[in-house]
């Protein structure tokens, strides 16, 4: 067993002083070690009154400016996932529904120069049920049924059916399908005896073992709940009015537990950013026995520690850029011809800091292509099917509308879909690049693009969901 490390008392006093000094720089915040993307909540509070710069040394951490404030992530700002679609604004016929996302992060802006905390909305049409409920009507009441008992007073019932007319589309008839009333047989019922509750057990001489006696405890009950009637005669209570049992097997007397001393301080739990140091104690002074109560309070306690070292941030790929023009070196005229060219696209690795991991994969892609930009080919084009209805725009403004489209689709030439570039390396796929000129029969007065618009109905208001929480 190794001896515990002796920490000089002066060093401990210095550490406690540093932890209690107020943070400098920006206003202090509540610092958390985890940001939960699925709920936009802060998890695992590290400490209060921490400076924003110290808390965000680790980009995986999060902070709140006040107890009831929004949770904000320390990472570079980016949009949260879209929320689930809210319930439809009406329960039948056509309505609308909203969803949202929030710019989450610190030290920058999301796309479109949106500041952290900004909400962005989407609105779409919805239809929970095509038709609305229609109420039905009741039939006439059936005759009353027989009385439920053969003596004394009971009840009888009668029924009716919801079919005059029948309800439609989930509707119903108002009122009840069955009703009851009292009935009297004019016959007296016998009263059968029933036991009242058992009385309490008599006291044993001791509540825990170790005494000189093994006492017996007894209890009794009476046939009085109710007593049996005499005319007409009722049945007596079955069974016995008394019972007894031995008090043997009483437990040993309990011993309550007590805390031992706090153990030594552990190292800081992290090597970068903010972490914790822990102390522990055991409930062994004495150990609880024979049902005695366990020690109250916590067996661990934590203090915040600051490594003052920023945590690595791995790089992340930006989206691929657009493909370059399809060309072929030393050959200028390949447009509209079955001549294979090449094009490239690139992407940028952003956000890498403090010796974080580089982005995996390549930053450039090359593919083979045919240049068909603004080309006219022999066959006429054809109109596409209607696209799905788009989102309602504006989602939070007045009179939002939705649009669907049909486009004139140009016919593509029957060029070879593959090409052999280097002998022994097999065939490579060839992609069409550019937009050929489309020539379609005129449709509703349009030659290229046909659009249909509709208003969005029963539009709900855009409200921050976090402001609706109690």
From Swiss-Prot:
Annotated SUPFAM superfamilies: TSP-1 type 1 repeat
Chain segments carrying region Interaction with Complement C3 beta chain: 350-358
Any one annotated GO CC term: extracellular region
Keyword Disulfide bond: yes
Transmembrane segment boundaries: none
Sequence ranges assigned to domain TSP type-1 in this UniProt record: 27-75, 76-133, 135-190, 192-254, 256-312, 314-376, 380-463
Record keywords, A-Z: Complement alternate pathway, Disulfide bond, Glycoprotein, Immunity, Innate immunity, Repeat, Secreted, Signal
Signal peptide start and end residues: 1-26
Protease among keywords: no
GO biological process: complement activation, alternative pathway
Subcellular location: Secreted
Glycosylation sites: 82, 85, 138, 141, 144, 150, 195, 198, 201, 207, 259, 262, 271, 320, 323, 383, 386, 389, 429
Summary of subunit composition and partner proteins: In plasma, properdin exists as dimers, trimers or tetramers in the relative proportions of 26:54:20. Interacts with the pro-C3-convertase enzyme complex (C3b-Bb) comprised of Complement C3 beta chain (C3b) and the Complement factor B Bb fragment (Bb), where it binds (via its TSP type-1 5 domain) with C3b and Bb. This interaction stabilizes the complex and allows it to become the active C3-convertase enzyme complex (C3b-Bb-FP). Interacts with C3b. Interacts with CFB.
Reported function: A positive regulator of the alternate pathway of complement. It binds to and stabilizes the C3- and C5-convertase enzyme complexes. Inhibits CFI-CFH mediated degradation of Inhibits CFI-CFH mediated degradation of Complement C3 beta chain (C3b).
Name of protein: Properdin
Species of origin: Cavia porcellus (Guinea pig)
